[in-house]
A protein has these predicted regions:
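Metal-dependent phosphoesterase core characteristic of DEDDh/y 3'-5' exonuclease domains
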Residues: 2, 58-86, 104-223
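Conserved non-catalytic scaffold segment of RNase H-like nuclease domains
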Residues: 2-124
């Protein structure tokens, strides 16, 4: 029986003291752009945001995966992989790759903005650590116009809105409650990896629920 596999990542900034000269230049450009756009933002917040959004300036601290049988009425199984620094990130990537490697059939992969963000981070961080990236061609499909095998809801609906907005639109409880993306770096710094995993898991379950609703009422959008 085929599976529906929703997944999501959380990211953290690298220590700017470890940056190469090229990373420093990239960091300065991105921070200055953020400060120009939001003058009331502190330098620290602008730096944290810039690093958490660029895979050469940050690392993946959590990947969560929700797996559900297409015909099942049972709640999806959820698995999380966490890292508290760039060194442990390498094992996170290996564990995630090995876990998703078991799915090689006619499965459907589901993300929200995964083709532009999550997959880009996954590839960059695997390359940085010399880790073989997942080999599933369905999961790794980044074509924004092909959503049959990798259903990126941000590409399917093409609306300038986030996951929380889509949840609100569909009447689904928002995963952005006890924490949102801006709080992930602080939680990791404080050693609260369980909180980060719970937040990431809430994201993948919400993404899965959104997908099931959209697929039910607009199945042709995934053709």
């Amino acid at each position: 029986m085929s599976k529906i596999i929703a997944w999501d990542i959380e990211t953290c900034p690298l220590d700017t003291n470890t940056f190469t000269s090229r990373q420093d230049r990239r960091h300065s450009l991105l921070v200055n752009a953020e400060l120009d756009k939001n003058p009331s933002t502190s330098y620290e917040d602008a730096s944290r945001k810039a690093c958490s959004l660029h895979p050469m300036l940050g690392f993946i601290c959590c990947i969560s995966v929700a797996v559900e049988d297409e015909a099942s009425l049972m709640r999806a199984e959820v698995h999380s992989f966490v890292a508290d620094d760039p060194e442990t990130e390498r094992q996170l990537l290996i564990d995630f790759r090995d876990f998703v490697g078991q799915f090689r059939g006619m499965d459907t992969w589901v993300t929200f903005n995964g083709k532009r963000f999550d997959l880009d981070w996954l590839l960059h961080r695997c390359l940085h650590h010399g880790v073989q990236a997942p080999g599933n061609v369905r999961m790794m499909n980044r074509n924004p116009y092909q959503n049959q095998y990798h259903a990126d809801l941000a590409c399917v609906l093409k609306s300038p809105a986030g996951l929380a907005d889509l949840c609100d639109h569909l009447g689904i409880e928002s995963p952005k409650q006890a924490m949102d993306g801006s709080g992930v770096a602080q939680a990791v710094a404080e050693g609260r990896l369980d909180d980060v995993a719970k937040y990431c898991e809430a994201d993948v379950l919400a993404t899965l629920e959104c997908y099931l609703i959209v697929k039910r009422f607009a199945a042709a959008a995934f053709a």
